From Swiss-Prot:
Chain positions with Phosphoserine modification: 185
The encoding gene: SDR9C7
Record-stated family: Belongs to the short-chain dehydrogenases/reductases (SDR) family.
Highest rank taxon of the organism: Eukaryota
GO molecular function: all-trans-retinol dehydrogenase (NAD+) activity
Database matches in PROSITE patterns: ADH_SHORT
Gene3D superfamilies noted in UniProt: NAD(P)-binding Rossmann-like Domain (3.40.50.720)
EC number: 1.1.1.-
InterPro entries: NAD(P)-bd_dom_sf, Sc_DH/Rdtase_CS, SDR_fam
Subcellular location: Cytoplasm
Biological process according to GO: retinol metabolic process; steroid metabolic process
Name of the protein described by the UniProt record: Short-chain dehydrogenase/reductase family 9C member 7
Binding locations of NADP(+): 29-53
Length: 313
């Protein structure tokens, strides 16, 4: 028991020694703080004594977060799909951080819907997701980078296991693959400025990313707007099984979202942040192996998850 106690003490000592100094003086800007990962991360960083600048999409989300935390947290409304909103947020952050710059930019804002079989979706469905998850992330980063460079700080980008292997149709996985590519490219470029870039690739966690209306209602809407010939080619049984499989996946989602926010926090406060974080057992044991298997093997495994269409050959 004494040996275990000593090892535990040494681990905590090393962990604390590897932290960035003067965290209480450093500013962190986080997008998507209404709920989920962004909301919990903002609270964790306030508890650490950091100065948190939290961007929310709704007034209600901003007010509740402000009420529940201390003076060290300030909120602003931000729509990452609108350039003017991003410009206003950038000026606000610049006014807050002054000459010391921005220690960490956390691009967390994201949406999951519309998603489904690609043929069931429209161009607008793809654009809606990509504009938030990828284009918005890129534009926020480009506006904030001068302040991050000044602080020799961090960029932490929220991707997904779906950014390593495409598990569902629609703009979600496409946008997350784009986040991976953008993050890899800026990491190499910003290395020379002393800026570190980390990518968070969670598995399946329970958040509000699928919106308020519910998955079944979303899938029914996609199905009912399809042309009759497309519905016939898939069949009602395909729709039912596909929807049930998605619902089962969501029901199995891990509610312990602190696994994700702890990874995000480590990327911000550690002197040696990782390039990639993979919170969640499914991320480590399922999605990462699927991403590394030969493509025909991955296709075979994932195709078993999809129902057979009525007109299959």
């Amino acid at each position: 028991m004494a040996a275990i106690s000593d090892l535990s003490f040494m681990y905590r000592w090393f962990k604390n020694c590897n932290l960035v100094r003067n965290l209480s003086d450093k500013y962190v800007f986080i997008t998507g703080c209404d709920s989920g990962f962004g909301n919990l991360l903002a609270r964790q960083l306030v508890d650490r004594g950091m100065r948190v600048l939290a961007a929310c999409f709704t007034k209600e989300g901003a007010q509740k977060l402000q009420q529940d935390t201390s003076y060290q947290l300030q909120t602003i409304l931000l729509d990452v799909t609108k350039t003017e909103s991003i410009k206003a947020a950038t000026q606000w952050v610049r006014d807050q951080v002054g000459e010391q710059g921005l220690w960490a930019l956390v691009n967390n804002a994201g949406v999951g819907l519309p998603s489904g079989p690609n043929e069931w979706l429209t161009k607008e469905d793809f654009v809606k997701v990509i504009n938030v998850n990828l284009v918005g992330l890129i534009e926020v980063t480009l506006h904030m980078l001068p302040m991050v460079k000044k602080a020799r700080g961090r960029v932490v980008n929220m991707s997904s296991s779906g950014g390593r292997v495409a598990v569902i149709g629609g703009g979600y996985c496409i946008s997350k693959f784009g986040v991976e590519a953008f993050s890899d490219s800026i990491r190499r470029e910003l290395h020379y400025f002393g800026v570190k870039v980390s990518i968070i690739e969670p598995g399946n966690f329970r958040t509000a990313i699928l919106g308020k209306d519910g998955l079944e209602k979303h899938m029914r809407k996609l199905w009912e707007r399809l042309p009759p010939e497309t519905r016939e080619s898939y069949g009602e049984e395909y729709f039912r099984i596909y929807t049930d499989n998605l619902k089962s996946t969501m029901q199995l989602a891990d509610p312990r979202i602190s696994e994700v926010t702890n990874s995000m926090e480590h990327a911000i406060v550690s002197r040696s942040p990782r390039i990639r974080y993979n919170p969640g057992l499914d991320a480590k044991l399922l999605y990462l192996p699927l991403a590394k298997f030969p493509t025909p093997v991955t296709d075979f495994i994932l195709s078993r998850y999809l129902p057979r269409p009525a007109d299959s050959v």
